[in-house]
Amino acid sequence: MSDHDNPFNEPLPKSPPDRRLILFAGVMLMASLGSVYAWSFFTKPLQAAYHWANWQTSLVFSLAVAGLGFSALYTGPLVAKLGGRKLMKRSAVFFVSGYLIAALGLYLGSGVIGDIQTPWVSWLSFVVLALGYGVIGGIGLGTGYLTAVSTIAGWHPDKKGFATGMIVMGFGIGALFMSKVFGPKAMEFAGGNVAAAFLIIAGVYGVIMTLACRSIYSPHAAISSKHVATVADTYEHLPNVRVRLWLTCFTYSLAGLGIISQLSRLMQDVSKSADSSLSVEALAAAGATLIAIASLGNSVGRLIWAWLSDHFGRVNIFAALLGTAGLAYLVLPHASSPILFSILICYVIASYGGGFGTIPSLISDLYGSKRMSSLHGLALTGWATAGLIAPPFFGFLYDKVPDQAATYAYYICAGSLFASMILVFSVKKLHKHCTSPAE
């Protein structure tokens, strides 16, 4: 292989890389990063041990979401300059360091420097936790997420939808694995000490991500060159391309993140209305079950919708998932049955996940593979902004109008998705390739 074919000076295997192995390595990396979606698993133990308020533990997650989106924006242009392997190594370093710094913050608040009841000790512990898990870890999240999607898409130009769907599905599966398997086991092994559990998690993910990075190679120039779209230069002059792309991702994410933040409460309210004799424990169990099933739907939806986009066109499928999810939201206020409610919720969450599987390939088809990473990073800032706005706003609705909050939320989500669908159709005319199966 010539230097031209390996511009990043990455170590190469003796035989040609197996793109299936690279895809598997990417999924493992994303599954590690996806553990951030299971943050709520640790919130109650943290609040019990450190006496932090709900807004404090929520802020840590919001910082991680913001870190993912805005570090992805910064990482986008670097993919073409540094290559996938180098950036994924950076991602691993930041992500694992985030857990280690967070563990340090928790140890500081566990009596090392003073009583956690002392205000300055509590705040110092919280600030270090937020800096580690939220800021440092968030940088690792965005760097790895953006790089993995761009790199894997480059290796599978003939099946971009399926490949990117697999990658982002790994992110969703990682959250389910953390909340139901790894997290409980780490806490059990650590004796219920969150700081010790974070050290265990950092060690395990450090090994997994290191092995995954060793199996990642940037796409060979010959693999993707004949598939790279040439439309990017044609449409580069349009001043509103980035605005429409950002608004599409923002409005679509607003609907998903707002409901995800209230899933347990919504399910408990519906279950209690259907059977007022249910105990608090039974209601909590119903909420937890819906979260687990919806998480699985989120993961599977990322793959299925993306795979469908390979066969029926990116814009067609993206618009379909937005429109049908919007209709489901309109039905939800009238879903008094817990079973019907669960089915509708799982569908809208699966569609939310499907958007993440479809957007990277849609961007690549519209603007070319060379600009995919930078524009995908821009789109993720729309998601990050929605993550900062939607959960607090939906929580505000519950505080002010608890009896009508769910109904208002469903209609807002429906309107947001329909607005996103209109934005998608507004770019459909940019290139006919987006309305036909991928070449």
Regions found by a protein language model. Give the residues of each.
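Symmetry-related core transmembrane helices of the 12-TM Major Facilitator Superfamily/SLC fold
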Residues: 195-214, 408-426
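A late C-terminal transmembrane helix in Major Facilitator Superfamily
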Residues: 175, 367-402
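C-terminal transmembrane helical hairpin of 12-TM major facilitator-type secondary transporters
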Residues: 249, 286-288, 292-362
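Interfacial helix-cap and linker-helix signal at transmembrane-aqueous boundaries
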Residues: 46-47, 78-79, 177-191, 267-268, ...
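Hydrophobic core of transmembrane alpha-helices in multi-pass small-molecule transporters
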Residues: 98, 111-143, 250, 340-354
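Extracytoplasmic gate region of multi-pass secondary transporters
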Residues: 39-44, 240-306, 390, 394
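C-terminal ends and interior cores of transmembrane alpha-helices
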Residues: 93-122, 324-336
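Intracellular juxtamembrane helix-capping segments at the cytosolic ends
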Residues: 46, 142-156, 163-164, 354-367
